[in-house]
Design a protein with these regions (language model features):
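Ferredoxin-type iron-sulfur electron-transfer modules in oxidoreductases and energy-metabolism complexes
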Residues: 1-7, 28-60, 77-104, 231-232
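Feature captures the FAD/FMN-dependent oxidoreductase FAD-binding
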Residues: 106, 111-115, 163-213, 312-321, ...
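N-terminal Rossmann-like FAD-binding beta1-loop-alpha1 element of flavoenzymes
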Residues: 111-136, 262-269
């Protein structure tokens, strides 16, 4: 506590705060840091909650070094304010001590269905519930959280932290339906028939890309996000160890160099892999992963092969992977023994909802097309979309930023429709 207050006191309270400019959701960082420096933890949390529904998550997984902390003027000649650690401290302190309890708003403005409970879905639900909407989330998994629960390792984002943030949503009046797949159990039309005024698609990108090389479809080639999900289920006691795939002594290669690649590589080490090497077609300076994530991976024993590609994968007569062929930028090839290849090359939206709903247009890669006014509405009236299903895979906070804008669009749309209905009713 003392350390957090002292760190907050280093803030210069700039007239034009660059930290706020660097934050995708425009957090009022100097304001809550000032309250923290004065020991007013409750006031600080009130300010944070005005912009973020997931402070304990953002305090852990946001790329602070590229955003708020990277813009801090103190960082030009020394160490910038540790904004992420301060946000994490406040969110955890609030979670443990119950600093604030938000008042439930009367739910009088309409009903909104949210499909998916990842960062975008949770942000929509929190924002609209605070504005007086009845919000119900439809989640296909047995537990909500999406990528927060199943795609980020426990060592980076403990599952109990995610559960705590979701509990806050439920305390706002948000209802969550588990194990319910829209496009299978119900359609979008079914939801409208149930009386929802608007529907939000926050389903992310669950359809994996294929590895288009010889041997790219053999046993042992897996999606990195699939692997992370299996490990998460195993850690929660919902999956047998043998179903996680990577075992002690395995030799593993990871394709890609974003944060998901770092997560997969470090998790493979934790699961007992003998060796893990990340293969990336560009240089270290061009990787999308945070430098801090890369540094941690190196410390834990992950190897890196730069400016190279895996161009072939070989298997034995039983179809089990035996080796990979790696080609560098000069065209030189070498063969390495391998048991598994994890692909961290991104993914695309699943078509389950679009294929069962008339009027929702997508681009040639399956991403949902939306418009600016009202922000986030698809080509189907009353159906909105945001986050990765529209903008391609990105960070948690960027999905949140987009979702906050969509929440405004939904509120404007529902209010306008109800006003028009009221006028017609008076005629």
């Amino acid at each position: 506590m003392h350390e957090a207050i002292e760190e907050a006191k280093r803030c210069l309270h700039c007239k034009i705060p660059q930290c706020k400019k660097g934050c995708p959701i425009s957090h009022d960082i100097p304001d809550w840091i000032h309250e923290l420096s004065m020991g007013n933890f409750g006031n600080a949390m009130h300010i944070i909650n005005e912009k973020s529904n997931l402070p304990a998550v953002c305090g852990r997984v946001c790329p602070h070094e590229k955003q708020c902390e990277g813009h801090c003027v103190l960082g030009k000649k020394g160490q910038g304010i540790h904004v992420g650690k301060l946000e994490r401290f406040l969110a955890d302190f609030d979670g443990n001590m119950g600093l604030i309890r938000e008042k439930l708003q009367p739910k009088t403005r309409g009903r909104v269905a949210v499909i998916g409970s990842g960062p975008a879905g949770l942000t929509i639900a929190g924002d609209l519930s605070r504005q007086g909407f009845n919000v119900e989330i439809f989640e296909m998994e047995l537990e909500p959280g999406g990528v927060l629960m199943f795609g980020i390792p426990e060592y980076r984002l403990p599952k109990d932290i995610v559960r705590r943030e979701i509990k806050k949503m439920e305390e706002l009046g948000v209802i969550i339906h588990y194990n319910t797949t829209i496009g299978k159990d119900y359609t979008v039309d079914d939801l409208f028939a149930q009386g929802f005024d608007a529907i939000f698609m926050g389903t992310g990108t669950g359809r994996p890309q294929k590895l288009q090389i010889p041997g790219g479809d053999i046993k042992g080639v897996r999606q990195a996000i699939w692997f992370l999900r299996r490990v998460s289920l195993y850690n929660e006691g919902n999956l047998d160890r043998k179903e996680v795939v990577i075992e002690k002594g395995d030799r593993c290669f990871v394709i890609g160099c974003g944060n998901t690649a770092m997560d997969a590589a470090r998790t493979a080490i934790r699961m007992g892999a003998e060796s893990v090497n990340v293969v990336y077609r560009r240089t270290i300076n061009e990787m999308s992963a945070l430098r801090s994530e890369y540094d941690d991976a190196v410390k834990e024993g992950v190897g890196f092969i730069w400016e190279s590609n895996i161009v072939e994968i070989h298997s034995n007569d039983e179809g089990k992977m035996t080796e990979v062929v790696i080609e560098d930028k000069e065209g030189n090839r070498r063969i390495e023994k391998a048991d598994y290849v994890l692909m961290a090359l991104g993914s695309a939206p699943a078509s389950r909802i679009v294929s069962t709903t008339k009027g929702i247009d997508v681009d040639d890669r399956g991403y949902v097309i939306t418009r600016e006014k009202p922000y986030g509405m698809t080509t189907r009236q009353g159906v909105f979309a945001g986050g990765d299903v529209v903008n391609r895979p990105s960070t948690v906070v960027l999905a949140m930023r987009d979702a906050k804008m969509v929440a405004e669009g939904i509120a404007q749309y529902v209010d306008a429709v109800k006003l028009l209905d009221a006028i017609k009713g008076e005629e």
